[in-house]
Amino acid sequence: MKRKLVYLSALFMIGLLATSCGQTAENKQTAVKPSDVLEFRDFGNDPFVFNIEDYTKENENYRTTLWTGEFMQLTIMNILPGEDIGLEVHMDHDQFIRVEEGEGIVQMGDAETDLSYERNIEDDFAILIPAGKWHNLINNSDKPLKLYSIYAPKEHKFNTIHKTRAESMADEHNH
């Protein structure tokens, strides 16, 4: 009888220990923050559902191509204080930009020397750039400007990452 009682007590203790260990592992799993699991790469033409705000705010590269489809592309950008995207025009496609964090100025116009449209931008602002409009976006604040951009059709090569603005400018031929 004493042996059975010791055996049952041991089984009870093992069960209790296993249960508490399982709870600890579960608690650790639920404590994972989204930023701990973000993967910065081009997810290609596969379906992709994600928190765009988390990705945009956590991106430390000047430009990261996050998704390149057949006819559309999504990039996220981190424009440092005093930097800009560089004056450019896209003749064959429109562009959508949304500011997630930071402040700056957007300029647009019909010619490289005529940027008559100028607006201040900040968190949650959207910018719609028609095909054929010259444009530039300037970070005139002391904090990074975090944004995402959608091109239709795509603008950059699959899996493009530019860690800095200088790297982006060196790759200008492909942009």
Name every feature range the model reports, one short phrase each.
Residues M1-K4:
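Positively charged n-region of N-terminal signal peptides that target proteins for export
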Residues L17-S20:
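C-terminal motif of bacterial Sec signal peptides marking the signal peptidase cleavage site
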Residues G22-Q73, G86, R119, H162-H175:
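A short, N-terminal "cap"/entry segment at the start of jelly-roll beta-barrel domains
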Residues T75-D92:
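Conserved short histidine dyad/triad with adjacent acidic residue
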Residues L87, V106-Q107, I129, H135-S141:
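Short beta-strand His + acidic residue motifs that chelate non-heme Fe in jelly-roll/DSBH
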Residues D92-A111:
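Glycine- and acidic-residue-biased ligand/ion/polar-headgroup-sensing regions
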Residues A111-A131:
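Short acidic-glycine-tyrosine-enriched beta hairpin
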